[in-house]
């Protein structure tokens, strides 16, 4: 397949200088899978971005959890993609369900933010996913495809730096996790959508990762699925040793190959 495994850690609104330092120490250990087989990106709150970008070994990249839709201006409390790029931040998470549901971010708004972030050279972790009632109503694909459409305004080339994160909302922070078969089913559908609506090349190369109660106990089975190209990890990414286990689940790709 040729798609490099990708593991992102979304720390959300968590962490103190002490706890963050412990996670960094773990991630800097040589037991973490090599950079040539897995891309590791951590996403701390804004206040920790400069320090973690400096303190983490160079193989580990840093992402912001959000950015503003424009260059800057009179937008109190917002941070622009230009500012992030100036700090040396390389990725940004956009479209996370918590921002969609709690802050009312629409598909269109998320798409505009992603397009601007790309224009500033940031890689985008593009989040999609359905609510429990939408899954039970058989609307999983419809919901995910509508969300994908908002990201499809990218020209072909910038898709090289886009990772699609399928995060079923019913599995985020609930302890429930999609089965490996459920994850694979949606990832295949997403790849087919990209093939039809963007290009066959983009569909083949784009990494589609899974998020939603991923932990050290289930990551290996999920990673063994052909179209699961990695993870976006929430709570478990705050536990250094467990996050390391998830990163090292890339070994499942070698077993499955």
From Swiss-Prot:
Q: Name one GO biological process term.
A: gluconeogenesis
Other remarks on this protein: In plants, there are two types of TPIS, cytosolic and plastid.
Binding positions for substrate per the UniProt entry = 10, 12
What CDD domains does the record tag this protein with? TIM
Metabolic or biological pathway, per its Swiss-Prot or TrEMBL entry: Carbohydrate biosynthesis; gluconeogenesis; Carbohydrate degradation; glycolysis; D-glyceraldehyde 3-phosphate from glycerone phosphate: step 1/1
In this protein, the active site sits at 96, 167
A GO CC term assigned to this protein in UniProt: cytosol
Q: What's the protein here called?
A: Triosephosphate isomerase, cytosolic
Its quaternary organisation is: Homodimer.
Q: Which UniProt keywords apply?
A: Cytoplasm, Gluconeogenesis, Glycolysis, Isomerase
Q: Which catalysed reactions does the entry list for this protein?
A: D-glyceraldehyde 3-phosphate = dihydroxyacetone phosphate
Q: Which GO terms describe its molecular function?
A: triose-phosphate isomerase activity
